[in-house]
Design a protein with these regions (language model features):
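N-terminal, intrinsically disordered, polar/charged segments of Gram-positive cell-envelope systems
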Residues: 50-94
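Aromatic-lined carbohydrate-recognition surfaces of secreted/lumenal glycan-active proteins
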Residues: 170-180, 240-243, 262-302, 319, ...
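Active-site-adjacent "subsite" loops/lids of carbohydrate-active enzymes
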Residues: 88-99, 178-230
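N-terminal Lys/Arg-rich, disordered targeting/topogenic segments
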Residues: 1-27
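Hydrophobic membrane-insertion alpha-helices, especially the h-region
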Residues: 27-47
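Catalytic domains of carbohydrate-active enzymes, especially glycoside hydrolases
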Residues: 110-136, 231-243, 308-317
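Substrate-binding cleft of secreted/luminal carbohydrate-active enzymes
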Residues: 41, 45-54, 305-358
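Aromatic-lined substrate-binding rim segments of carbohydrate-active enzymes
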Residues: 132-176, 250-285
Length: 358
């Protein structure tokens, strides 16, 4: 007897029910994922859509081009204007002085090394001798009356000044004014003559090595000194230290100054004021060096044509003697008092190869 077949239809019916439920779940998940994707895409695309809409609105409706540089510049706020820092004004009454030798400026390498050494020592003013009492100029001057005065060995003065400035130092040109035995032989009108003669007045017997001097009353001599000052100023030396602004120490009545001039302090004062004013107008500073004894003397000094107070010096450097006198402190006190009485603005005291403010 055969076994009756099992009815599997009901089982098939249940399978279809379960299958339908799975499809519903999967469909719901798919719709949810699609909705989320739409939101994500919309979120990401929103800036571009807004930009496009804005651009369309302004270009089509308003007639403006947002992509043009002028429009972009107009839409950006102007940057705030910064106030420039004020340029510091150098104080001419601060810092120590050092007197350098020409050998320290014979090459660019030595210039840089010399500047570095003075910088490490805390020096501010570095004095370079560019014209001394021998009459020689230690730079290649182009002045016509300097044709015989340029020394055999010179330095590049402009490069020396630049090297010092790069190190934060102030270059100072040391110049001797009227004690000059060379220039008179180039232009005889510049020298002091004996009264009513064509012979040069000499500061000693010729056999003893007597030398001529430049005449403070000679227009040619005064212009020559002014030319040297102007020349070194143009090379970068804003500070000038001038010595030898005087008459010969042993001048006598036999000296015949140009134009019948006499050895007076008022004439030297006029020259100093003229040079100082010219320098100041061009941003320069003039210092004048005189020996201790000349400044300290209460009596008229022949070389000055009067007393120190008559000269009207604004910035003074007192040169101490090589041999220290017994009454040095007394003389220095008197010199400082004379400078104060004369209303000298700044005073320094030079000893050997350095100087300090007082």
């Amino acid at each position: 007897m055969s076994k009756p077949k099992k009815n599997l239809g009901k089982l098939k019916h249940y399978k279809r029910i379960f299958h339908t439920r799975d499809q519903i779940v999967h469909t719901a998940l798919a719709w949810a994922a699609g909705i989320i994707a739409v939101f994500v895409v919309g979120y990401l695309a929103a800036p571009a859509v807004l930009d496009f809409g804005t651009h369309t609105w302004y270009t089509v409706v308003k007639g403006r081009d947002l992509d043009s540089p002028s429009s972009a510049a107009a839409s950006e706020p102007a940057p705030a204007q910064s106030t420039p820092a004020p340029t510091p004004v150098p104080n001419v009454d601060q810092g120590s002085w050092a007197f350098a030798s020409l050998s320290g400026f014979s090459s660019p390498e030595k210039m840089a090394e010399t500047a570095r050494q003075y910088q490490e020592k805390g020096v501010h003013y570095v004095v370079i001798p560019l014209k001394d009492s021998t009459g020689y100029l230690y730079y290649p001057s182009t002045l016509p009356d300097a044709s015989k005065s340029v020394a055999a060995t010179t330095i590049d003065a402009a490069a020396a000044a630049a090297a010092l400035r790069e190190a934060g130092l102030e270059p100072v040109a040391s110049l001797c004014a009227f004690q000059d035995p060379i220039a008179p032989y180039t232009n005889r009108d510049m020298g002091i003559h004996y009264q009513n003669t064509e012979y040069f007045w000499l500061d000693a017997e010729q056999e003893a090595g007597g030398k001529p001097w430049l005449d403070p009353w000679s227009e040619a001599a005064v212009n020559y000194v002014a030319g040297v000052i102007s020349e070194v100023k143009a090379m970068g030396f804003n500070t000038i230290l001038l010595s030898g602004v005087q008459y010969p120490s042993y001048a006598t009545s036999s000296c015949g100054y140009a134009g019948g001039g006499t050895a007076t302090a008022s004439h030297l004062a006029q020259l100093l004021k003229s040079w100082n004013d010219t320098l100041s107008a061009d941003g320069g500073t003039l210092w004048v060096q005189y020996p201790l004894a000349a400044v300290a003397s209460a009596d008229p000094v022949a070389a000055l044509g009067g007393t120190y107070a008559d000269l009207g010096v604004q910035r003074l450097m007192i040169a101490m003697p090589a041999e220290v006198p017994e009454n040095q402190e007394e003389l220095l006190t008197a010199a400082k008092a004379a400078a104060k009485s004369a209303k000298t603005e700044s005073v320094t005291v030079k000893t050997a190869d350095s100087a300090v403010f007082q």
